[in-house]
């Protein structure tokens, strides 16, 4: 498991779902449906009725569930390094994934050609998971309305190539002007535009359009013989007009400040100690060490530390953890999940009590629960599974300054790089990309080489102070699970953890 690319922070406080007016909501849904039917289905000689007929062929066998997932993705990327654009690429991929489920067994087939023949052959392949002998029924398609939680414009067309390159050069210009110690700048810009159409055996059909943009910045600072790195960036479900000069300057300043701070960093101390985690991106630790363990498949298989603990205390009082896929424009947000269900706000832990899991259709059915709109897949070539969207801890009642001031000795981890977690045990290790030594309630000096080691479920029980500054990351997170990567959001307020964490460093 892993989330990569990280930066902070957009205040969320208590996150409210964004609903448009009824008329705008209806128009947006109609626009999505018409665009997807025209540019994805009709462009490949298909109609919703064609998909229903293929599903009816699957339905002649004894299966519990089946779906067809059609997708067309356009992807563009640009990368600047050493003052020049080193690479630029544009790709279009389309195809179909067909799935049938019988009990705990799943049959899945996909094709990178989208036409009636590839769908028919895929349907014939997967239906053998169930015994033949049912009467065929062609259900009239009934389209499910998704939530209008983000715009639908194609970001690839929102700027021409010259303007995209100019944006990357602007990043370099700002970074080198910020401080003479910045000696190298790397910047990447990616745009994605997905068209999705889902047809299910129960007659439900759903369409979605998913834009996604990301700007990533890395700088190298040099002082004497010492070189240090700083990173920042952001994005979401926007077009490229989102990256205003003001926002780009903010990203650049964050990357530069991190690099310059690390130039002054001393070796991190090592040992058991109290830790304060900053708001925003440090929620990646919550995502990895706790969030994956709250996904339905791990709990159905009894491989999670949270298996069978609904209704039990699993965290300190005040700890409330939520997964919410319908926050406006966020990287992890979706109008519908990849099984055609609306995304939603799912409370997982409430005031320290485990109250629910994230579910897709299959695991929800097998556990006697309802889907929470968390069925996600990387592409048409992958079967869906329960996945996080935007996962965060809600606010507490303490000012972040008060939390730091309460720490006699310990580490304040402002930002994280990579990490690893074992879902079954909950054990994790994360590397801090920016951290400070705190003594007598004051920041003393930055430290380098700090790794945070602990057990996710145990750490939750030792949260002693929760800040009132809950924030989501800036919008560049990518989560990996079972070989599939999907965009996600993470977040939390400032937290003080009094036990259960070991800091690994070079200074004992």
Positions of predicted regions on the chain:
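N-terminal small-residue-enriched
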Residues: 6-508
């Amino acid at each position: 498991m892993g989330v990569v690319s990280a930066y902070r922070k957009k205040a969320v406080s208590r996150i409210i779902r964004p609903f448009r007016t009824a008329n705008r909501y209806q128009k947006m849904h109609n626009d999505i449906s018409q665009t997807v039917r025209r540019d994805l289905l009709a462009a490949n000689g298909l109609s919703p009725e064609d998909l229903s007929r293929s599903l009816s062929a699957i339905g002649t066998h004894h299966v519990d569930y089946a779906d067809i997932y059609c997708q067309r993705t356009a992807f563009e990327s640009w990368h600047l390094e050493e003052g020049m654009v080193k690479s630029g690429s544009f790709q279009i991929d389309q195809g179909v994934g067909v799935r049938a489920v019988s009990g705990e067994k799943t049959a899945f087939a996909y094709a990178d050609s989208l036409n009636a023949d590839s769908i028919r052959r895929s349907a014939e392949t997967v239906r053998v998971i169930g015994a033949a002998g049912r009467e065929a029924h062609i259900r009239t398609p009934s389209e499910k309305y998704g939530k209008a939680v983000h715009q639908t414009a194609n970001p690839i067309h929102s700027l021409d190539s010259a303007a995209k390159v100019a944006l990357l050069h602007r990043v370099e210009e700002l970074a080198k002007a910020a401080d003479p110690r910045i000696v190298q700048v790397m910047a990447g810009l990616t745009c994605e535009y997905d068209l999705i159409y889902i047809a299910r055996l129960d007659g439900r059909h759903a369409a979605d359009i998913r834009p996604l943009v990301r700007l990533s910045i890395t700088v190298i600072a040099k002082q004497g013989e010492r070189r240090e790195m700083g990173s920042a960036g952001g994005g979401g479900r926007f077009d490229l007009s989102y990256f205003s000069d003001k926002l780009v300057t903010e990203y650049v300043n964050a990357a530069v400040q991190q690099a310059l701070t690390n130039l002054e960093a001393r070796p991190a101390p090592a040992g058991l100690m109290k830790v304060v985690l900053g708001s925003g991106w440090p929620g990646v630790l919550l995502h990895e060490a706790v969030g994956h363990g709250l996904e339905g498949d791990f709990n159905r298989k009894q491989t999670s530390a949270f298996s069978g603990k609904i209704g039990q205390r699993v965290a300190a009082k005040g700890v409330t953890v939520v997964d919410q896929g319908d926050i406006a424009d966020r990287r992890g947000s979706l109008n519908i999940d990849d099984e055609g269900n609306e995304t939603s706000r799912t409370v997982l832990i409430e005031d320290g009590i485990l109250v629910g899991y994230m579910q897709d259709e299959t695991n929800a059915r097998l556990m006697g629960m309802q889907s929470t709109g968390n069925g996600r897949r990387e592409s048409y070539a992958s079967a869906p599974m329960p996945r996080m969207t935007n996962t965060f801890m809600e606010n507490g009642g303490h000012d972040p300054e008060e939390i730091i001031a309460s720490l006699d000795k310990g580490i304040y981890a402002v930002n994280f790089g990579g990490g690893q977690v074992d879902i079954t045990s909950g054990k994790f290790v994360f590397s801090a990309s920016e951290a400070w030594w705190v003594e007598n309630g004051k920041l003393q000096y930055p430290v380098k080489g700090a790794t945070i080691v602990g057990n996710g479920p145990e750490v939750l029980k030792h949260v002693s102070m929760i800040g009132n500054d809950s924030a989501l990351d800036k919008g560049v997170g990518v989560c990996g699970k079972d070989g599939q990567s999907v965009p996600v959001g993470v977040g939390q307020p400032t937290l003080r953890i009094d036990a259960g964490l070991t800091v690994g460093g070079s200074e004992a």
